[in-house]
Amino acid sequence: MSRIGKKPIPLPNKVTIDIKGQHIAVKGPKGSLELDLPSEVTVNQEGETVEVQRVDDSRTARERHGLFRTLVANMIQGVSQGFEKRLNIQGVGYRAQAQGSKLTLNVGYSKPVEMTMPQGINVAVENNTQVVVSGIDKEIVGNIAAKIRGVRPPEPYKGKGIRYQDEYVRRKAGKAGKK
């Protein structure tokens, strides 16, 4: 039995879940999300909890049991609390600006890099060097944060670049030089 898959998911107040066959719709104060389940997994709501169960003990059913339990739990957390990723920009003259759904990054290239955020994703810039990506879908928030980081990943010699707030960048020593 999957240790993750067998845990029931608590359903917070103001969050409703609608299960129609293999289709799930979760609505909450921050928005709504939908998910189609594979045939190996079923979802049942019992009072204030949601349980994900597998149909049989085949290998694919066992693999997907824990995965879809986590996906449903992330949907419930997303519509009730939301998700956010914070990125720090380090480097002389490196900065970011946000205008509506557009993020402009000045990170050492000849022209600024402009990125347009998809619908449902909010981007904010705090003191020109910290970018906050937030939304209700954990997968999209993580992908957008990874794309922003990919514009200028941190380099190991001086540490310049865009990094996650909790990321540790291993530093390297430069060339030894002549003696």
Curated annotation (Swiss-Prot):
Q: Name one GO biological process term.
A: cytoplasmic translation
A Gene Ontology term for the protein's cellular component: cytosolic large ribosomal subunit
Which InterPro entries would you find in this protein's record?
Answer: Ribosomal_uL6-like (IPR000702), Ribosomal_uL6-like_a/b-dom_sf (IPR036789), Ribosomal_uL6_a/b-dom (IPR020040), Ribosomal_uL6_bac-type (IPR019906), Ribosomal_uL6_CS (IPR002358)
Q: Establish whether keyword Ribonucleoprotein is in the entry.
A: yes
* Alphabetical list of Gene3D superfamilies matching this protein: Ribosomal protein L6, alpha-beta domain
Question: Which UniProt keywords are given for this protein, alphabetically ordered?
Answer: Ribonucleoprotein, Ribosomal protein, RNA-binding, rRNA-binding
- GO MF annotation: an example: structural constituent of ribosome
Which Pfam families does the entry mention?
A: Ribosomal_L6
How the protein assembles, per its UniProt entry? Answer: Part of the 50S ribosomal subunit.
> Belongs to which family?
Belongs to the universal ribosomal protein uL6 family.
Q: Which NCBIfam families match?
A: L6_bact
Q: What does this protein do?
A: This protein binds to the 23S rRNA, and is important in its secondary structure. It is located near the subunit interface in the base of the L7/L12 stalk, and near the tRNA binding site of the peptidyltransferase center.
Q: What is this protein called?
A: Large ribosomal subunit protein uL6
- What organism, scientifically named, is this protein from? Crocosphaera subtropica (strain ATCC 51142 / BH68) (Cyanothece sp. (strain ATCC 51142))
